[in-house]
Amino acid sequence: MTDQLIIFDTTLRDGEQSPGASMTRDEKMRIAKQLERLKVDVIEAGFPASSNGDFEAVKAIADIIKESTVCGLSRANDRDISRAAEALKGAARGRIHTFIATSPLHMEKKLRMSPDEVHEQAKLAVRFARNLVSDVEFSPEDGYRSDPDFLCRVLETVINEGATTINVPDTVGYAIPELYGNFIKMLRERVPNSDKAIWSVHCHNDLGMAVANSLAGVKIGGARQVECTINGLGERAGNCSLEEVVMAVKTRRDYFGLDLNIDTTHIVAASRMVSQTTGFVVQPNKAVVGANAFAHASGIHQDGVLKARDTYEIMRAEDVGWAANKIVLGKLSGRNAFKQRLQELGVTMASEADINAAFLRFKELADRKSEIFDEDILALVSAEEHSNVDEQFAFVSLSQHSETGERPQAKVVFTVQGKEVTGESDGNGPVDASLKAIESHVKSGAEMVLYSVNAISGSTESQGEVTVRLQNAGRVVNGVGADPDIVVASAKAYLSALNKLQSQAEKVAAQG
């Protein structure tokens, strides 16, 4: 008889706290639908009280997600909790996740509250939340660095008040696997009513041990929920990686003895979607989802894999969604083949009209490059979905002129709220000239803090995927653009970032 391990994904909340990872409502909705296809148990959709934008995103996700539980974060006060409950009204299954810091450092320096005041506020918050929804999660922020006696007292109280999940975060990534696992075990043994709640772990990766700590919390501590993000996305060094913890539990079922609801064949599609949406490129040697995760360069290894895959592979690439063949389509491919490939990649589009529009973009791309890879398809689908969103700025065309020894000239045509405009400029290279051409009309005043180019596939005619990170008035956003022409991709990425600067609202800080 095995136990069930609940996977709680917080890509849309804690993951979004990475500088530049801010997502629009429509982007969050697309990722939420992918998480539902992945069969994630709980989707933490955002922090409704932090901004009107986050409230609307959580509300929209609650309305469209039918299989997964949709969770909203709140601080331990009536206003935040009420706001979360309001956003979750349309959810088939809704959860309020409320938190307050319990470590001496946080209580004294941040909250300026006594332990008794924190205890009382936690009690009242869970009581209030439990009157609004049946599923309430409580987190003692910086729980791992809290006094065990005080923490046990708080956790016993909130369980008595109706908390159904107790999440113990290692907020600053300070824990060591064995110590963290024993810490969870100690809490479960010392809290008299611990059996009345599901115990959860939430680990940050500051020392590179978020996955190891989470697994120790499960194996040693007896936790039955893991909080994680796609690609390990998160502020500072990131969070526990969903794909790594899931595949560890699945691959080593002999050791963990746990069941999962996750459909692992959608992992790679989810990873690519999050990467392309946020602009956070997945490193090639990233476990499970990196481009080299199933690559073998050593002749000895290659020989072994050809003879028997299990000589050097502990899991199958196709089990996590990697395609067996990379080159799948070309300019002679028809709409049905394109649609079939979308289904194989785990991509679901809203309507036949959207598929038709994406297919037209595919045919345009196929006229420009002979081999179309899965990565190309995902990039153009992502671009098509973005083009359907009401945006202030949209790319139309670009022309440039450059000769050796002279400053390049660029002219960029784009729309501003549907009206076509033209910007022209010279620059210290074609990319610089093109972005200055856009700025000559927009005059955003934003500072570029990152510019990076990633080849989507491995040939010289590959599409370039450009990430641009802009900072303005304390806000940081990423824009992503893809095109076989790097200069065009750069202009698209810059306009994408400008759109996010226009739409992003200020937010209240959440827990780490």
From Swiss-Prot:
User: What's the gene?
Assistant: leuA
Task: Write down the top EC class of this protein.
Answer: transferase
Enzyme Commission no:
2.3.3.13
Q: Domain Pyruvate carboxyltransferase: where?
A: 5-268
**Catalytic activity, reaction form:** 3-methyl-2-oxobutanoate + acetyl-CoA + H2O = (2S)-2-isopropylmalate + CoA + H(+)
Family annotation (CDD domains): DRE_TIM_IPMS (cd07940)
Q: Which cofactors does it use?
A: Mn(2+)
This molecule's function is given as:
Catalyzes the condensation of the acetyl group of acetyl-CoA with 3-methyl-2-oxobutanoate (2-ketoisovalerate) to form 3-carboxy-3-hydroxy-4-methylpentanoate (2-isopropylmalate).
Q: Known InterPro entries for this protein?
A: 2-IPM_HCS-like, 2-isopropylmalate_synth_dimer, AIPM/Hcit_synth_CS, Aldolase_TIM, LeuA/HCS_post-cat, LeuA_allosteric_dom_sf, LeuA_bact_synth, PYR_CT
Query: What does the similarity note say?
Result: Belongs to the alpha-IPM synthase/homocitrate synthase family. LeuA type 1 subfamily.
Question: Which residues are involved in binding Mn(2+)?
Answer: 14, 202, 204, 239
- Mind telling me which SMART domains this protein's record contains? LeuA_dimer (SM00917)
State the name under which the record lists this protein. 2-isopropylmalate synthase
